[in-house]
Design a protein with these regions (language model features):
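Intrinsically disordered, low-complexity terminal regions
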Residues: 1-288
Length: 288
């Protein structure tokens, strides 16, 4: 089944999907087009319209399958949706993987399945409870979460000063490359955390894992205030470190120091914490 409706370029679209893979793409057309393969019938419900044009500014895509559990949710072998590039999407799904490309903003929650987001310029909230979360070429405030999956972010930037990048997983790994937010919070309980990028002046960076390792791959001339705590693990840095304060107990070790050489402008503050894993800091030039 395929249907389309005229919409404003900045239309907000919400829907839920009970079953089926999901692909959402931005387009230059001022319409919302939906194709459900071998699935439930559906309809467009305009929750709000532009009074001048009559086009939808807030749209709910809902199933017309009748009463029952998840009765308002679309379902099928696959669901393909085309939206204006300035649109925002609010998606909840159960057993499905989602690929979202080239829309303004995305809010996604999936129970079983992975989430892939590309070219989302206005911010992301994505939670895959039993799947991976991957973000590429996107911007704005970003919050990513998963329970059992991994998180990968590549080429990501803030939209405004103060935008936060946050990633959290319980048993998966976190890998960040080219993430240029000045505020980054990344945490895992039993997985590793890896960062390949630059610490910007005045930035606040917090990387934490309980049972995994922390790996930083940064430019050779990096400088920051470093706060590190490691219980039964180890610490190693190839970049010179001047320790200012240090505390050693039976439960571990923590210190505050200057990594690299003092530069003009406020230094970034970097906090690295692990209970039983290792912390390693390497130069990007050594990885080439």
């Amino acid at each position: 089944m395929e249907r389309a409706i005229a919409a404003e370029p900045n239309v907000a679209v919400k829907l839920c999907i009970a079953e089926g893979t999901i692909r959402i793409n931005g387009s230059e057309r001022k319409e919302v087009r939906v194709f459900v393969r071998n699935g439930r019938k559906f309809e467009f419900r305009s929750l709000e319209k532009n009074p001048e044009t009559g086009k939808a500014t807030w749209l709910w895509i809902a199933s017309t399958s009748g009463p029952g559990p998840l009765s308002n949710c679309l379902a099928g072998d696959s669901v393909d949706i085309d939206l204006p590039v300035g649109a925002s999407i609010d998606l909840e799904a159960r057993t499905a993987g989602a690929v979202i490309d080239s829309v303004k903003k995305a809010n996604v929650k999936i129970v079983e399945g992975s989430i892939s987001l590309r070219n989302i310029s206005g911010g992301i909230q994505a939670n895959a409870y039993q799947g991976d979360v991957m973000v590429e070429g996107s911007g704005g405030p970003i919050e990513l979460g998963t329970t059992t999956g991994n998180i990968l972010a590549y080429d990501v930037k803030p939209g405004n000063v103060g935008d936060l990048f946050k990633a959290a997983t319980r048993s998966g790994q976190i890998a960040l490359e080219g993430v240029v937010h000045r505020q980054i919070l990344a945490s895992s309980i039993s997985g590793s955390v890896a960062f390949n990028g630059k610490f910007l002046n005045g930035g606040i960076y917090n990387f934490k894992t309980t049972n995994g390792s922390i790996r930083m791959l940064i430019p050779d001339d990096s400088a920051c205030k470093l706060i590190a705590a490691y219980g039964f693990g180890s610490f190693d840095s190839v970049i010179p470190l001047k320790i200012e304060t240090e505390n050693v107990t039976g439960g571990g070790k923590n210190f505050v120091g200057l990594l690299g050489k003092q530069t003009n402008g406020p230094l970034a503050t970097v906090t690295l914490t692990t209970s039983s894993g290792s912390i390693g800091i390497r130069k990007q030039s050594e990885d080439k």
